[in-house]
């Protein structure tokens, strides 16, 4: 079994998912193209880079070898896939595992490049979504269009959300859209966001962002979000405990 995986910057999954698939080694590379295909805010680029570096450490703590390349390692401006193919040839890797890539254009480019380079690949189903590609595709049937309202019905039945034992909606309602457009009252208490420690990579990444992406909007000073998986899960817990109860009524409101 081939046990080397190519992981993109948005595929920072629970390491156990990789271990369950026999993963022993991972290739990760920061990519200039990812940071510049749009003129992203500097904090978004900061999140990309810090999260990837923190995830590298998490994989290593789980006994997975990581071949990691920062932007400083890639100043020759090769594309992401060109860089990976060069790495594979140097390491004599002739087969790679990848997860489905949600960007279909980029996925097609990656797969065709691997084929041209003579590198075999095995594709694993992504754990990123609630519906698999096959399952989602089957929802369309012969219809040329598929409305969100129909998708919600399927999802509620699949996950048993507000339905009875026969799959009928509780209260005879499939939609509650008209109830999520309330204005937030002026005296409503909105809990403060939890505080997170800066990443150990903060200084290095903030410096890279300012040096390489100086023309992008914003700055990398006001970091208010987590950059590790564990702290992101903590933030989710905080949302469910502190905010979820009233989220539905005000989800379309702006402050």
Model-derived features: positions:
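N-terminal beta-strand-loop-alpha-helix module at the start
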Residues: 1-71
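An acidic- and aromatic-residue-enriched active-site/binding cleft used to recognize and process polar
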Residues: 10, 31, 71-72, 101-103, ...
